[in-house]
């Protein structure tokens, strides 16, 4: 599902490779996205984030819209979704696969193996901050940008000879959204601000101290009632003029300058516990942010962000098109070969990971941290048959290793919930993750069999744990995650079977993610011994064997896996001269499927077989 990717992220490592951190030069190129008109749709807005909060800034002069996210606002509540019928029917599906009845096998898997309770919960928008500026519908000299050097969004324009500026940050250090409003003449800042939300039954109140609150709860989805309670709080600090708060609208009139603050919090503690107090958390974030002036808050925010950004620099030459808007540079790229745009793209990829994955928080999901819908495409979940992994490919090679912490915690948590699923669905020890999970760390097979009958998500995620060790040599880290690696390897050791044609050890049933094969006349994905499965398990077992030697533990298990590796299907070259995607030579040279899953080991590991 390559369309579901973290915006602008996918080619960072493929295009650039391993970049060594270096000292900043005295003359450092400026990295920014800039435009000469406001955003018309959500995908044109500029993304800000601090790992926990996301903001999409439209930059419209008359009525600013800043769409807001908080990383733990998801539909539903704690649950797992393993289907107990799977234990009986997976062997029957396997028999059909081995008999060459692939479509029948896939149909049976959809009916009897896939989750019946739910297919995972959607990540949901909080809502919007809307700021109306009377008289600002006619303007000139418009400019907006996203500074990748400082994680700030700037909007500038002129109305009736007055120059206005908005500066927005999602503060890493204060954990609130701040919008700074200034003009080049005194007394010109007048606005009405409010919080809105697409959620049903939200409650909006005006409180003492010129504060607006918006409270709500996440959505019901697939029969699972939403239980994530959230609250947003809106206030402002003005110099000069008047401030008032009535009927959920915060108004400032005739100020010299003003700063708008938004805090958001939920009751989410972890995937099993939602007993937190969202009101007290939102109050605390806001009150602590109001202690310091905006200039100090911005300084702290920028310094925090740049500690990540400046670990790596990429200079591909002079910026020859700095006076051309970013959208035009992208449009012209095929003719201009704009090297500085490539460098900007590289830093934009790093920027997005910094802004959507901070230690202590949730990992970057299908849309990072940015989503304007209650029910987004593919639920904006954690799709584990390439998308979640792909978000983090740049982390080690671009010197953002510590931003893996949310991913590593997710892996630990799905290894816990996945033990239950392994027992219920497969009668196996160890742990399993299929092709998707969410904030509740569901691990059952979901959606329909063409995508969902794939038990190798855990094996792929384990590669990220091993990768951390390979980059750092940190044996204590390896010791802490070794049980996760081992238990995943144990699961595959128990569920893999010998297929009847070659007597090879294979995963069955499974699929080469989402791609149909000619063994079913292009009607089914379900198969046995898919090359990607073979590669992932080879990689996992090899890592476990190496880790056992490094840690001087589990020698018998390592020796057992070494023997099992010899029984696995090898990589095979088909009659087109291609690396086969499946155990049989089913590849079609006209296949234009967006996945090339059987090449995964070439990218993520060392294809030594």
Model-predicted regions and their roles:
Residues 487-490, 511-513:
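Acidic helix/loop microenvironments that form the catalytic cleft of cell-wall polysaccharide enzymes
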Residues 508-540:
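C-terminal, helix-dominated tail/subdomain
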Residues 1-24:
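Bacterial Sec-dependent N-terminal signal peptides
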Residues 22-450, 456, 465-469, 475, ...:
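Aromatic-residue-lined binding/catalytic grooves and analogous aromatic/hydrophobic interfacial grooves
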Residues 481-484, 490-493:
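Aromatic-lined substrate-binding rim segments of carbohydrate-active enzymes
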Residues 607-609:
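Short "domain-exit" segments at the C-terminal end of structured domains
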């Amino acid at each position: 599902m390559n369309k579901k990717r973290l915006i602008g992220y996918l080619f960072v490592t493929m295009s650039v490779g391993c970049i060594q951190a270096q000292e900043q030069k005295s003359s450092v190129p400026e990295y920014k996205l800039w435009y000469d008109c406001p955003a018309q749709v959500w995908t044109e807005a500029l993304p800000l984030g601090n790992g926990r909060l996301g903001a999409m800034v439209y930059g419209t002069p008359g009525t600013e819209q800043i769409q807001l996210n908080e990383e733990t606002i998801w539909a539903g509540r704690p649950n797992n979704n393993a289907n107990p019928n799977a234990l009986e029917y997976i062997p029957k599906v396997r028999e059909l696969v081995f008999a060459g009845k692939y479509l029948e096998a896939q149909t049976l898997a959809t009916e009897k193996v896939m989750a019946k309770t739910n297919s995972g919960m959607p990540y949901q928008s909080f809502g919007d901050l809307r700021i109306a500026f009377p008289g600002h519908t006619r303007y000139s000299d418009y400019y907006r940008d996203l500074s990748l050097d400082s994680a700030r969004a700037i909007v500038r324009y002129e109305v009736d000879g007055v120059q206005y500026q908005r500066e927005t940050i999602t503060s890493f250090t204060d954990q609130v959204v701040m919008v700074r409003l200034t003009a080049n003449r005194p007394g010109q800042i007048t606005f009405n601000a409010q919080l809105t939300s697409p959620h049903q039954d939200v409650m909006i109140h005006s409180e003492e101290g010129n504060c607006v609150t918006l409270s709500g709860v996440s959505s019901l989805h697939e029969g699972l009632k939403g239980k994530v309670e959230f609250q947003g709080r809106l206030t402002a600090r003005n110099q000069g003029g008047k401030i008032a708060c009535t009927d959920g609208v915060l108004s400032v009139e005739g100020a010299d300058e003003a700063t708008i603050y938004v805090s958001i919090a939920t009751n989410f503690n972890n995937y099993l516990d939602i007993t937190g107090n969202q009101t007290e958390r939102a109050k605390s974030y806001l009150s602590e942010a109001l202690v310091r002036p905006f200039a100090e808050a911005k300084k702290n925010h920028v310094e925090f962000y740049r500690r990540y950004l400046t670990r790596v620099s990429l200079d591909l030459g002079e910026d020859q098109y700095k006076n051309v808007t970013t959208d035009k540079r992208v449009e012209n790229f095929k003719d201009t070969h704009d090297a500085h745009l490539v460098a900007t793209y590289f830093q934009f990829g790093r920027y997005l990971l910094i802004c959507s994955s901070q230690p202590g928080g949730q990992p970057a999901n299908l849309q990072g941290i940015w989503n304007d819908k209650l029910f987004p495409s593919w639920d904006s979940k954690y799709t584990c048959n390439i998308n979640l992994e792909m978000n983090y490919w740049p982390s080690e090679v671009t010197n953002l290793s510590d931003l893996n912490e949310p991913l590593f915690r997710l892996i630990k948590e799905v290894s816990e919930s996945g033990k239950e699923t392994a027992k219920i669905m497969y009668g196996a020890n160890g742990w399993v993750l299929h092709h998707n999970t969410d904030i509740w760390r569901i691990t059952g097979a979901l959606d329909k069999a063409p995508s969902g009958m794939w038990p190798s998500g855990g094996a792929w995620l384990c590669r990220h744990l091993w990768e951390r060790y390979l980059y750092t040599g940190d044996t204590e880290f390896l010791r802490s995650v070794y049980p996760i690696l081992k238990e995943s390897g144990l699961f595959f050791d128990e569920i893999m079977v010998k297929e009847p044609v070659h007597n090879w050890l294979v995963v069955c049933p499974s699929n080469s993610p989402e791609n149909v094969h000619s063994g079913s006349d292009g009607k089914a994905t379900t198969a046995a011994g898919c090359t990607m499965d073979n590669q992932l398990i080879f990689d996992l077992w090899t890592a476990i064997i190496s880790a056992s030697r490094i840690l001087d533990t589990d020698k018998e298990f390592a020796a057992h896996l070494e023997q099992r590796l010899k029984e696995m299907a090898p990589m095979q070259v088909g009659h087109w001269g291609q690396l086969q995607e499946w155990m049989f030579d089913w590849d079609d040279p006209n296949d234009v499927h967006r996945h090339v899953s059987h090449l995964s080991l070439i990218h993520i590991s060392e294809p030594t077989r």
